[in-house]
Amino acid sequence: MIARAVPKTGPRRSRLLYVEEHAENVALAEALLAGRKDLLLLHAADANLGIKLARSRRPEAILIGIDVDLAGMSALEFIKVLRADPATETTPVLALAADTAPGAIVKALEAGFFQVIAKPLQAAPFMEALLFALEFAAVERSEYNPLKESR
C-alpha cells in the first residue's frame, strides 16, 4: 500500500497518489517514475484507502483509473468526495481512461478531474500531464496565490 519509491535524498519530493487495484499498472507507473528523484509514488489499492491517503498525506497530484470501480466506489464518486473536502478540493486528479472520446473527456472534466490521460499509460503524455498538475499544485499551495483571493 503506502510509499514505494527511491530513497529520499535532497529536498522534499512531490507526492503522487495512484489509486489502482492492479499491481502491473502500479509497476508501470513506478517504472515511468523511477528516474525522478523529486517524486514519491504513493499507492492505494482501493478508493477508500485512496481518500484516507489523500486527506492524510496531502499529495500534490492523484492518478486514478476512471473506467473501473475500486472497492465499490466509482471514480466519479471518488472525485465527488475529494471535491467536497476542503483539504482535497483543489488537488489535481488525473483520470486514466480507456474512453477518450470528446464526450467522455468533457464528462470527466465537468465532474472535477484535472485532466484525462489515455490508457494504456504512456511516458510522454503521462509526464506532461503530471508536470502540469504539479505546477498547478505548487501555485495552489503557495503563500501568494491570486486564485485564492478570488474565491
Regions found by a protein language model. Give the residues of each.
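C-terminal output helix
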Residues: L121-L130, S142
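Two-component/phosphorelay signaling modules centered on CheY-like receiver
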Residues: A23-L42
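Short amphipathic alpha-helix used as the core "switch/output" element in two-component signaling
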Residues: K52, S74-E89
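Short, glycine/charged-rich "phosphate-handling" switch motifs in NTP-dependent
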Residues: F114
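Short acidic/polar segment at the start of the alpha1 helix of CheY-like receiver
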Residues: H22-L28, L70, T100
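Acidic, metal-coordinating helix/loop segments flanking the phosphotransfer/catalytic sites
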Residues: H43-A61, V68
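CheY-like receiver
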Residues: I2-A3, P7-R12, A138-R151
